[in-house]
């Protein structure tokens, strides 16, 4: 069985042969981490075009190795809150073994094309595997237009521990600008659409990232308040959805502190 180091070398070779990205001429690194970075840069930049069976077999083997390198996190491992149907998980959303995780997507729905970018869209697309971008391309081709803010789309999660990914596009807030009622409602719509889609698909566990608070600039405090208030209201309006467990995933200590505070009933944003 080839090592991850060797698999990366073979994948890089195949991707560079295509000459589809700006990194195609980079020399093959001798260090594992540098190979990982180069492979990720190549696959991040690659257009949503079919891939060879040889490449996909190598990627499957590499991402299977990645998947085996950690213990997935289930709902029972998540932090309980004062609400029986709401949980918190502080860490990497890629490690969650739930029915679906929510990806903060962009309007193209094809993932992040910036090499090795730190956004959640990049991380999810990279480690779910290249089939995810192709699946999203099929959705966008059928749809025939950019994805609207506040909608939701469902795909397989491929190599991630989760079964599915729900993709939603949140609103942008220009730095220094206040949150208008329209943008607040658009963010709330992301949560409602994702919950509606989860129920329609028969899912029983759904993990939300902090939608729009990264590259899209939505203030973290207001975003957390909107997220919690919207989910609680949706649950109250959908008593038949009691089987759906909702997890709020936080990645920064600031986000965790906000959700810890607002999920106490005396501070519940309602």
Swiss-Prot record:
Q: What is this protein called?
A: Protein-ADP-ribose hydrolase
Q: Which InterPro entries match?
A: Macro_dom, Macro_dom-like
Cofactor(s) required for function per UniProt: Zn(2+)
Q: According to the UniProt record, which cysteines are disulfide-bonded?
A: none
Binding site residues for Zn(2+): 112, 117, 119
Q: Which organism is it from?
A: Streptococcus pyogenes serotype M1
Q: Name one GO molecular function term.
A: poly(ADP-ribose) glycohydrolase activity
**PANTHER family, alphabetized:** ADP-RIBOSE 1''-PHOSPHATE PHOSPHATASE, GANGLIOSIDE INDUCED DIFFERENTIATION ASSOCIATED PROTEIN 2-RELATED
């Amino acid at each position: 069985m080839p090592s991850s180091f060797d698999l990366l070398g073979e994948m890089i070779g195949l991707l560079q042969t295509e000459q589809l990205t700006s990194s195609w001429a980079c020399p093959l690194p001798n260090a594992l981490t540098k190979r990982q970075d180069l492979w990720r840069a190549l696959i991040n930049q690659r257009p949503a075009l079919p891939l060879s069976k040889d490449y996909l077999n190598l990627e499957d083997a590499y991402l299977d190795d990645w998947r085996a390198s950690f213990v997935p996190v289930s709902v029972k491992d998540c932090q309980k809150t004062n609400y029986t149907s709401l949980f918190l998980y502080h860490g990497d959303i890629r490690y969650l073994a739930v029915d679906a995780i929510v990806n903060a997507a962009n309007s193209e729905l094809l993932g992040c094309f910036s090499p090795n970018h730190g956004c959640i869209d990049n991380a999810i697309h990279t480690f779910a595997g290249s089939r995810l971008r192709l699946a999203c391309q099929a959705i966008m081709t059928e749809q025939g237009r950019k994805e609207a803010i506040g909608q939701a789309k469902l795909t397989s999660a491929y190599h991630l521990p989760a079964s599915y990914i729900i993709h939603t596009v949140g609103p942008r807030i220009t730095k220094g600008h206040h949150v208008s009622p329209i943008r607040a409602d658009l963010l709330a719509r992301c949560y409602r659409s994702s919950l509606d889609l989860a129920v329609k698909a028969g899912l029983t566990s759904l993990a939300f990232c902090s939608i729009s608070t990264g590259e899209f600039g939505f203030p973290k405090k207001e975003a957390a308040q909107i997220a919690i208030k919207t989910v609680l209201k949706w649950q109250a309006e959908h008593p038949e959805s009691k089987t759906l467990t909702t997890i709020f995933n936080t990645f920064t200590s600031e986000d965790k502190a906000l959700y810890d505070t607002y999920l106490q009933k005396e501070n519940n944003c309602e």
